[in-house]
Amino acid sequence: HNDYLASIKEDLFDEEVFVFTPKGEVVGLRKGSTAVDFAYRIHSEVGNHCHGVRINDRLSTLSTPLQNGDFVNILTSKTAHPSLDWLNFVATPTARNRIRQWYKRSHRDETIQRGKDLLERELGRSGFDALLSSEAMTRVAERCNLQSTEDLLAALGFGAVTLHQVLNRLREEVRLQTEAQAQPLSNEDVARKLVEQQADGAPTRERHGDSQPILGVEGLDYRLGRCCGPLPGEAIVGTVALGNHGITIHCQDCPNIEAIPSERRLPVRWNPAVSREGQRFPVHLRIEVIDRVGILKDILMRLSDGSINVSDARVKTAYGKPARIELQVELGSAELLRRTMNQIRSMADVLDIARTGQG
């Protein structure tokens, strides 16, 4: 045994360490690797459930760097799971990626459960169970530009879509399935049809030219709603405030317009020339990330590569928990927002991203 160990040590490369499993099998790792790197090298489930280590038959911390010739025995438990702190000391890309994957999956499971809880409170247990397997739920996910019911629940749990939006779209889908033709149009349907009729009138564009971003509020003071920050490409509605406060432009599914009576709603639409002129509008994003040095810089670089201007950036951190990044970016369309969010969401350390209001 000693001769075998000595022969291996003679052939070691400076950048590697060679250690042994309890059965005497040799495992090569990058220099500086720890018990966590070793555990993930054995199997992802060993890494995901390790809670301690014996090195040369002595209890050691998981962050202890392994030395050539060490015998490593990983202690596991079904209730153990990775810690974000491990990312501060692991040395191998395999371990780092597996920890990220576990945390993303765990975070997704939690947000899906939160989404389920929100819907179940509104619909009751039996109604919620029926909803999960319904075509209506699938179509609502599609309308929210999401791939599946699970994606919709996760987006609801994180706040990327609101309960109000989901319930409103569910009502529409259920009405369609139960012959909505026999029922009166909702206020939202009426407003949408008015907007469509207005959009069909060519003289409107000639009368207002290309400089007016919102058509339907000519001669009136208006502002974009801080609560939803509408973008060109999104269906919008104007609301008239009590008193002399002008018109506020909201996304059509903004929760804040639910309590506003129909007589104070104004059909409006985006001028198609807005996107051609390259006008930009503020959008607020909330991003949850695995906390590490340089994560904000990496996100800002990704946005810069896409020629996206960032006008404000703030980070909130708490030890052992995901960091939260609040960004204000300037975008010209709903489609650009969708692409931008997908690009950020695809980054390794990003757990989730949602569009938010300004306050």
PLM regions and their residue ranges:
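Internal insertion modules embedded within essential enzymes
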Residues: 1-31, 35-328, 332-359
